[in-house]
Amino acid sequence: YFAHFKEQEKGLPKLMIGTKWQDSQPETEIMAAKLKLKSILAWPDNENDIPSWKKKWSKAFSVGHKEVIKTSSRLAKALASYAVLIKQKIPEIYSIETDDGVIHKLHESFKDALIKDLGISDFADMIAQTIAYGLFSARTTGKEISGIETLAESIPSTNQFLRDFFSGLESLSGDGPSDLDFDDFSLYGLIEMLNEAKIGAILEEFGTQFNGGKQDPVIHFYETFLSEYDKQRRVERGVFYTPKSVVDVIVSSVHQSLIQDFNLPLGLADHSTHIVDGKAWPKVMILDPSTGTGTFLEATIELIHKTMVNHWKSEGVKKSEILDLWNNYVDNHLLNRLYGFEVMMAPYSIAHLKLGMKLQQTGYKFNSNIRLNVYLTNTLEKPAPISNWVPEFISIESSKANEAKEQIPFSIVLGNPPYSKSMTMNQWITELMKPYKQNLDEKKSDINREEWKFLRFATNLVSESEIGIVSFVINNSFLSAPTLRRLRSKLLDDFSLQIYNLHGDSNIKEKTDEGKPDANV
């Protein structure tokens, strides 16, 4: 696509927009690009504000003329621009389809098996992120994407859902009136952009740390994507980055508690078993119910790896033997104890990518049968039977998530739940929240916020376990809000509490001892 201004005999220059047609680019993609350019390249109200209109005009193109994407930041922005096009297209197709149309069927399948209250807008968002990050995941293998037909094979085996998703889409595609047309989603343009990107340099960037080790580049990539793609969604879902220092405190506190309070010398690395309902389970089963991009699970892997290496060294194991022992440990004693739930598609995909990279950095070699136990699911929804008509690639993911919710005796629940107004209201979570609401007569209450639902989910999950630890970064209002008094009372009845106040609460305008604004977490 290209644009230029044509001088007029009278008045302002005229904006001329043209396209370079390619067989692989459908008319819908061309029209979307024209609309985007027309809105961004409008003549400025203030011609003298040169920096302002230059900045606005530069947004018209995800990359410059003949520019190849070499950085994660530029790639995130380009990926977001395609995701926006896909997200806009899905409701258009939905509105003209019959109930038997592919988009209608997919929507109903996701509602039945994954997220019960999934509206068409949120569904479009999920599919857009799935496609964008699915293709990105395929490209991270280092190989170019040869085409839609072989896309599923290109996605890392650690993310079986994405592999099955694209296999399922391929089976639904075709030229018939009720088939799925990949041209409608600008996939060929997205594939071309990803293939031309310097993926090696970008992955090397992922292996480093920004700002003197203070910022994770994978998180930076995701936050750049989300800010370009949908800022409001980030606020609604309470998606915010947890500083690594805070993550490390949470994970290490759980580790130390297992050692000191539960007499497990290896802490989070312990894989001894006990009998639960007649079956042997590891005592330390770990869940992050709001996984996001996998930061807490990544820190857990780091700590467990360090613990086991030190343990083997203390036993006199030769350095040359430790790598084999670690690979065996991951296969048999780590992956089966590490779980995550995530409801948003982009962070779900990044979590798989990030955890896979972390394990590879420790020297672990994935075999083709291994997948990570991070599942796409709404933590706050009760598991329900899955209809027989739901496509297999969706039903498998949902079945695995339901199995984890219902059958696995989790003893450790950690993470940073979303801070947002109530997004999930169903009979199951409403019933579960009742102990937090007893004898509350306030007309206004924040007790239905998402973070308190996640806290209730977590405490309920571990309450029957021989070992039970919940370690969350939680809203500061927990300490003093009157409407949370029953919540605090319930926790005091059931748990031994340890509270680390990270300070820096802007809502109450905390000050330092010197009287300055507290800039802590």
Where are these regions (language model features)?
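Class I S-adenosyl-L-methionine
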Residues: 497-521
